[in-house]
Amino acid sequence: MHILTQNNPIREEQKTANWLEILADAVSDPKELLHILELPIEKFEKSIAARQLFPLRVPRPFIEKMEKGNPKDPLFLQVMSLEQEFIVAEGFDKDPLEEQNTAAPNILHKYHNRLLLMVKGGCAVNCRYCFRRHFPYHKNKGNKANWQQALNYIAQNPQIEEVILSGGDPLMAKDHELDWLIKRLENIPHLSRLRIHTRLPVVIPQRITDEFCQILADSRLQTLLVTHINHANEIDDMLSAAMAKLRNVGVTLLNQSVLLKNINDDAHILKKLSEKLFRIGILP
């Protein structure tokens, strides 16, 4: 099924752009984002200040999916800094999932047969609802030294059957880094599945390179990729094409959504999201 999108000259240029170039060109100034979307800066002064609590970062392909002049656009609301972020709520916990005490660098081992490995601390887009915005990534740096410690831990725990690559966003790692890591995971005999949780292809579809697809195609591990898509407006032709490349090499595609007030907390919106996900081969 083909998903129609508006013809956009900037989008045409970016079809052939390198994902790292697009990432480097991401918008980090709230005022620039407001200018692009033709929204009045004076109405967002207090929200702009919340940038100091958590930086704004939005790749331009994702901005192109937003409706200009609409302050209630569901994609804009996910990334724009908010005045409400200054509210100090009684009982609020900066580590709600108790993730800051780890058995080894970069890992979370909550469940008997699977383990989460934080590949990289950064993301291509900073979502305002991020529950790891306070995670001490400086103590869990995404480098080969820490990955090797995680690999040693996995090798010493034969009950682990599945490794989940997370972050941050694991696809912030370059293809050669992922190749290094995945090949070493393959060498651990008790591992059978690899799960990759990522939002990067949603905001920069060019991240799904031929080299990355080949790495997954060559792996002995059963591979699943879980996208993070919250609204049907995030899905377009370029994302569809990227997902098709993954399906063609046998990757199982799933989606994880966050229920967000005034963004997707409506049955009709969620139904439309599920239908679009099915259309591009992703199981909601």
Go through each PLM region and give its residues.
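Flexible, acidic/Gly-rich N-terminal and inter-domain linker regions that tether
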Residues: 1-109
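N-terminal pre-triad scaffold of radical SAM enzymes
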Residues: 55-58, 101-131
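Conserved catalytic-core segments centered on acid/base and nucleophilic motifs
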Residues: 117-118, 163-165, 170-171
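Short, glycine/serine-rich, charged loops/turns that create anion-binding
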Residues: 123, 135, 170, 201
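Iron-sulfur (Fe-S) cluster-binding segments and ferredoxin-like electron-carrier domains
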Residues: 130-142
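Surface-exposed cleft-lining segments at the edges of enzyme active sites
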Residues: 137-139, 167-168, 196
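Conserved AdoMet/S-adenosylmethionine-binding subsite of the radical SAM
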Residues: 148-162, 171-284
